[in-house]
Amino acid sequence: MGKFEGKIALVTGGTSGIGLATAQKFVNEGAYVYITGRRQNELDKAVNQIGKNVTGVQGDISKLEDLDKLYDIIKQEKGKLDILFANAGIGNFLPLGEITEEQVDRTFDINVKGTIFTVQKALSLFPDKVGSIIVTGSTAGSIGNPAFSVYGASKAALRALVRNWILDLKGTEIRVNVVSPGGILTPAYDELFGDALEEVLENSRNTVPAGKVGTPEEVANAVSFLASDESSYLTGVELFVDGGLAQV
């Protein structure tokens, strides 16, 4: 029997990379999983790849009506939620002198506002106020990166929110933690760096203490730990999955 047998999980941003790997991990461990994504074709491909015990729901977490639709579906079909992996997010490079209002609004709409209401609207679905919430942060929220300040600020905001949420949730058994990846080989990572990817990978081999970038599966393992009873006395922590990058 898997450690998530009988559990219902939601993974936002579950169509590729870390989200997809985590959804697959949850299913492999016995959970029924809902995944979200903004593009139906990518959602369909992810559902087919996972293969069983999964439902895809199209939506944009920055739109509250999409979140309401999502949670209505989960409530009607399963009646509860045990695990929430609030993973959906975006990021792009723009140096200070080129930051636009559109970039700031879009990044904070999805990464911050979207995550706030993803978590808030899930609370009523946790049975007997018991469950685990994991929020995707980033090493960019803790260390500086050229041209990445807006994204970094949005992830630092999530870290601050979680510190406060654990106080708001005192008296329940709902735990909230942050998983903060460093460089992880995902489709989004490829898209972010484009032609500079090989240079980035070589730089990582020289600067990351582990000597490499990570894989989505390595992050999924950390999320699985935080979602499980194995981490029952952990709440409010930030677990870095970064090969030691943020520690030096």
From Swiss-Prot:
It is an enzyme of class 1 (oxidoreductase). Substrate binds at residue 138. Keywords: Oxidoreductase. The active site is at 151 (proton acceptor). One of its GO terms (molecular function) is oxidoreductase activity, acting on NAD(P)H, oxygen as acceptor. It holds the Pfam family adh_short_C2. Its EC number is 1.-.-.-. NADP(+) binds at residues 12-19. Belongs to the short-chain dehydrogenases/reductases (SDR) family. NCBIfam families: PRK07231.1 (NF005559). This is Uncharacterized oxidoreductase YkvO. It comes from Bacillus subtilis (strain 168). The gene is ykvO.
